[in-house]
Amino acid sequence: MLTALQADLASVVEGVNLVWVLTVTFLIFFMHAGFAMLEAGQVRAKNVANQLTKNLLTWSIGVIVFFLLGAAVSAIVAGLTGGPATTVADAFMGLYAPDASATTAWVDWLFGAVFAMTAATIVSGAVAGRARLRAYLTYTILIAGVIYPVVVGVTWAGGFLNGLGFHDFAGGMIVHGMGGIAGLTAAWIIGPRMNRFNADGSANVIPGHSITFAVLGTLILAFGWYGFNVGTAAAPLAYSDGGVTLGSFAYVGRVALVTTLGMAAGALGAGGVAFYKTGKVDTLYVANGVLAGLVGITAIADDIVWPGALVVGLLAGAQLPIVFEFVEKRLRIDDVCAVFPVHGSAGVLGTLLYPVFAVPVWHEGASIVSLAVPQVVGVGVIAVWTFVATTAIFGGFRAIGQVRVSADHERQGLDTAEHGVDTYPEFGSPDADTGIRADGSGIPYGHGFMTTQEDE
């Protein structure tokens, strides 16, 4: 039986843990400001308001859907695939009207919701400049209500991949990998922007309007990532036998360290490969390399040490220019904000490298094969589910001619055509003869990723 002092101490521990979870949750929420700036900087000036509107509505619609439907779907799917058994009624009412004893129910939901909205908003960058808003928002409803919750159900919520031993600490594959694959699939179905590719299949670069915004967005995202990774250590204190010990905080320093080193190595990897290929250090490659390094670390940050973080971050950054060029020149898919090489392939890479750098392999003698098999199966299941679901939704809209805006609206710009606003009104209207504005929104097409060209 707990004494009064012990009971008070237990309450203090729970309170500290809840404050920690809420703090990192708010930090992760602020990552949406980073996504908004990163994507706005990489689109043309005539499409900035459209991109910002999609970011705002992704959160606003998605978080309501995740509350009303998505969280319950996760619990139901988990119960159907080997996780904790639950009824449909309990899955919904456990969130709508939790028991008095379930003091953390809504905090736990909010923590899960910011992860869900991160997965949802990744897609918007891939389809920028031509996606019809109603198609995109319908997909937002379904990714928040069904697609992402199914992935969570078979993994974090206790489903069959969790039972198999699949390891994803903070969403390298569950959040970022699936978001990147969904974005690539959507961009493939919608098709490229006008004049993105020539008749012979060669690519034209349509430069974004503000590297400044893109870099600012990168740094905001990197800051929020500390909430994403470090915050997943969700119970800093533990109470047992009348005493308080460090819970997840026993390893939180290592998570913070490998997160920091991973992002830095990612920037160097992407910048180095870009320099090797073009003779120039592309600013956007460096910025996106920071994010690719972070994505690569996210699935395994709890179970690796600093040498592994440097290698994984470097590889995640280095693959970015290579994969982007493959998507652009071989697949001829117009992934505007490079969401697949930043989130998709980097997330897959980091998740699959877990058995190579995992602490249990080197310190506990675990078998690499025993750790590798669940990772391969998990990546495959998540990738196939995401591809099939995304194809069905955007393919359906394409079949009825509602997946992308009209050619006139795309040419005019979605800010004025779809929203009735001009993001930069002080620059005036495009010149009737050249189509070039003072803000550069009609700038002739260049070469390379965004700014550079390989030497002849």
Swiss-Prot record:
- InterPro entries of this UniProt entry? Ammonium/urea_transptr (IPR029020), Ammonium_transpt_CS (IPR018047), NH4_transpt_AmtB-like_dom (IPR024041)
- Any one cellular component term from GO for this entry? plasma membrane
Keyword match Transmembrane helix: yes
Chief subcellular location: membrane
- Provide the site residues for: Twin-His motif. Important for optimum substrate conductance: H176, H343
Inducing stimuli: Expressed during ammonium starvation under nitrate-rich conditions.
Q: Where is this chain's protein located in or outside the cell?
A: Cell membrane
Q: Which keywords are on file for this protein?
A: Ammonia transport, Cell membrane, Membrane, Transmembrane, Transmembrane helix, Transport
For this UniProt entry, which segments traverse the membrane?
Answer: 18-38, 61-81, 109-129, 141-161, 170-190, 211-231, 255-275, 281-301, 304-324, 339-359, 377-397
Q: How does it sit in the membrane?
A: Multi-pass membrane protein
Origin: domain of life: Archaea
Any GO BP: ammonium homeostasis
- Which GO molecular-function terms appear in the entry? ammonium channel activity
Task: Provide the assembly information.
Answer: Homotrimer. Interacts with both GlnK1 and GlnK2 after ammonium shock.
Reported function: Involved in the uptake of ammonium/ammonia (NH(4)(+)/NH(3)). Transport is electrogenic.
Q: Which PANTHER family match?
A: AMMONIUM TRANSPORTER
What does the similarity note say? Belongs to the ammonia transporter channel (TC 1.A.11.2) family.
Q: What is this protein's record name?
A: Ammonium transporter Amt2
